């Protein structure tokens, strides 16, 4: 299999820049497929001087760092100009391989999908595509003053939907969005829920994790992990915590934010923190590797995901696997990742007072919080990556047997 993840590398640290759940998804899926006997070669754009041409994250998986454009990170909006160059370089790399061919292509995100259409036609092999996010869906939830996703992206995604042999969606809701917004054929969509690394994200003693992470033993610890951008909604959680603190000064509040700024540079989270009167209780840290992230999840009383749009929300699944309840927006894949009222709370909308209510309810009811944590860990056990790989592999087989290449 040839994987295309051109705008971001699966070797990048999630939570930094454009790296997020998709990076985890691409790498974990590739590793799980390799365990099933599928050789996976991932193509991504080289973004730093001295980067090796090939990296090996695990047996049966390699990552090709493709030379195209300057060896530095570029805004996603500039990458379409490099697509033809990347296609040429990927084909050159293919010709250097002993096997010289791939059975199919699996592209991730629209930039890779557009390149995938060209490579699919060039190689005579089918294209399987996963959107991860969709322009038309994101444009429905824009906040005032936010720049919409460009028409070029919408048109590119439409071409991908029309030309791919199969589409892999994270949830039934995402499949419905592909049909309603892009006119996708439901018979060509396979739903493969993402997984979680159940060897890393496991429950453990909260007090021990708090000691490791320097969290006070008896504080009410709220955690946000993700890219710092409006779409992920950290400003909603900060405003809600500010309301909660004014409402309940008796609560020993402690807040941790793990992640770095992504996208628009004018988004100033520190301004929201200071405006809410929370500067003395918020600790902002850079993103961390998976084992450390799991320890942070275990140290929290609740993990928050106030996203405006999520195709799935891997953070929610990882937190639950650690035995921590999640409060999240009732949107996209989060409504599937979380069992409302059992493993966490789904909040309709983004009104800070509604979020403050949810957090206050969990603070006041320790027993419910603990019960949710236990149920959350059990719930997450059904989301292993091998299940994702099995469904995705069947999608590849359907694509190859149909021998569908891009239709013009």
UniProtKB/Swiss-Prot annotation:
Which positions in this protein are listed as binding Mg(2+)?
297-298, 300, 324
Q: What is its EC number?
A: 2.4.1.250
Entry's Gene Ontology molecular function annotations: acetylglucosaminyltransferase activity; D-inositol-3-phosphate glycosyltransferase activity; magnesium ion binding
Residues that hold 1D-myo-inositol 3-phosphate according to the record:
7, 18-23, 76, 109, 133, 153
A GO term (biological process) for this protein? Answer: mycothiol biosynthetic process
Instruction: Name the top EC class.
Output: transferase
UniProt keywords, alphabetically: Glycosyltransferase, Magnesium, Metal-binding, Transferase
Q: Where does UDP-N-acetyl-alpha-D-glucosamine bind?
A: 13-14, 21, 227, 232, 288, 310, 318
What InterPro entries does the entry give? Glyco_trans_1 (IPR001296), Glyco_trans_4-like_N (IPR028098), Glycosyltransferase_grp1 (IPR050194), Mycothiol_biosynthesis_MshA (IPR017814)
Q: What top-level branch of life does the organism fall under?
A: Bacteria
Q: Can you state which reaction this protein catalyses? A: 1D-myo-inositol 3-phosphate + UDP-N-acetyl-alpha-D-glucosamine = 1D-myo-inositol 2-acetamido-2-deoxy-alpha-D-glucopyranoside 3-phosphate + UDP + H(+)
TM region(s), chain numbering: none
Q: Which NCBIfam families does the entry link to?
A: mycothiol_MshA (TIGR03449)
Protein family membership: Belongs to the glycosyltransferase group 1 family. MshA subfamily.
Subunit info?
Homodimer.
What's this chain's function?
Answer: Catalyzes the transfer of a N-acetyl-glucosamine moiety to 1D-myo-inositol 3-phosphate to produce 1D-myo-inositol 2-acetamido-2-deoxy-glucopyranoside 3-phosphate in the mycothiol biosynthesis pathway.
Q: Output this protein's name.
A: D-inositol 3-phosphate glycosyltransferase
Q: Which gene encodes it?
A: mshA
């Amino acid at each position: 299999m040839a994987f295309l993840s051109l705008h971001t590398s699966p070797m990048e640290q999630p939570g930094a820049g454009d790296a997020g759940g998709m990076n985890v998804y691409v790498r974990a899926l590739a590793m799980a497929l390799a365990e099933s006997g599928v050789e996976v070669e991932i193509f991504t754009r080289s973004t730093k001087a001295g980067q090796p041409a090939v990296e090996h994250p695990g047996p049966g998986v390699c990552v090709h760092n493709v030379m195209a454009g300057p060896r530095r990170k570029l805004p996603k909006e500039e990458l379409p100009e490099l697509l033809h160059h990347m296609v040429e370089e990927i084909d050159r790399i293919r010709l250097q391989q002993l096997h010289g061919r791939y059975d199919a292509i699996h592209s991730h995100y629209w930039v890779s999908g557009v390149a995938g259409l060209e490579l699919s036609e060039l190689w005579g092999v089918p294209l399987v595509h996963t959107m991860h996010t969709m322009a038309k869906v994101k444009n429905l939830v824009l906040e005032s003053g936010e720049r919409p996703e460009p028409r070029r992206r919408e048109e590119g995604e439409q071409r991908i939907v029309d030309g791919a042999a199969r589409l892999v969606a994270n949830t039934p809701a995402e499949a419905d969005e592909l049909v309603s917004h892009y006119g996708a054929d439901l018979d060509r969509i396979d739903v493969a829920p993402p997984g979680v690394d159940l060897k890393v994200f496991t429950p453990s003693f909260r007090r021990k994790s708090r000691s490791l992470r320097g969290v006070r033993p008896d504080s009410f610890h709220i955690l946000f992990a993700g890219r710092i951008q409006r779409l992920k909604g950290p400003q909603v959680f900060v405003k809600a915590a500010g309301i909660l603190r004014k409402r309940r000064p008796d609560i020993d509040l402690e807040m941790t934010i793990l992640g770095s700024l992504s996208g628009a540079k004018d988004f100033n989270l520190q301004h929201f923190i200071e405006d809410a009167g929370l500067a003395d209780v918020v600790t902002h840290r850079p993103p961390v590797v998976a084992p450390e992230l799991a320890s942070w999840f275990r140290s929290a009383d609740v993990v928050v995901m106030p996203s405006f749009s999520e195709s799935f929300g891997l953070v929610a699944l990882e937190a639950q696997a650690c035995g921590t309840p999640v409060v999240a927006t009732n949107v996209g894949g989060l409504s599937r990742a979380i069992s409302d009222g059992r493993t966490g709370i789904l909040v309709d909308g983004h009104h800070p007072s509604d979020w403050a209510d949810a957090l206050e309810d969990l603070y006041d009811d320790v027993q419910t919080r603990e019960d949710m944590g236990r149920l959350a860990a059990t719930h997450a056990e059904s989301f292993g990556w091998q299940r994702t790989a099995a469904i995705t592999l069947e999608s590849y087989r359907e694509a190859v047997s149909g021998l569908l290449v891009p239709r013009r």
